[in-house]
Amino acid sequence: ANVGSVYYSSDQFLNLSAINPAFNLLASMEFGEKYEDEFDFFPEEQRASLMEGMYATADTATVSVLNTKRPNILFIFMESFGSTMIERQGGVKGVAPSLDRLASEGVFFSNLYANSFRTDRGTVCTYSAYPGLPTLSIMKVPNIARKLPNIAQSLGKAGYQTDFLYGGDINFTNMRGYLMAGGFQKLTSQDDFSMHDRNYSKWGVPDNITFKRLLAMLKEREGQKEPWFTAFLTLSSHEPFEVPFKKFEDKHRNAFAFTDDCIGKFIKEFRKSPQWDNTLIVLLPD
């Protein structure tokens, strides 16, 4: 049940009041089946032993890579952009020169994996630190999703302005409901773009246009004292790979090259902003 489509307020009581209770009850019945036996591979003691090593931390001083304690944070979630398209990771040559260049300029994590296999699961994994489940999308279960911690909620409590930008249908897989419950104060989606911008691809607004919107949004904040956290989910490297760009004959590679080109142009322009020196930019494939 995509109940997030009726969410309209930062007050979750009001959002929950807008849900049809009878419909919600019937929809929740599909989650009654239990799947524990299908994925219960190890005894509890062995599971605890395996997990213990993952949480080990070195007893050393933390090395800071920032020049401020309250930086602006721009999180760019790159649709489907795995290492197969990154040359320095052994991927296809020439597809992502911008990302290859940025990797050498910043801090590059070469052995980092998301615990998910779809964007809805990867989003929850990234913002809420909740691992993607094999048979169930937590984003589609509002009663669970709204109770999860969220980086937007934490930063909001710390005085940050929080917002989310996506050029597609933000109601898909109940994304709107999850994001609003998670503390994102403003959402921008395909509904906030003209029909002309939306008509190029059936999946939504192409990345060159959404990156321009992102740049305009950030420019409006120049001079404001309140720090901000902006999350941006790209779109064009998703099938059907319809992009206003021609570098490769292969549509798949060409779409990824287009997103990379958009990222490179955005970074080039944002470097000119007075906010550049006080902004942490994180790029992560979904």
Functional labels for PLM-detected ranges:
Residues N2-P285:
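Soluble catalytic regions of membrane-associated enzymes that act on cell-envelope
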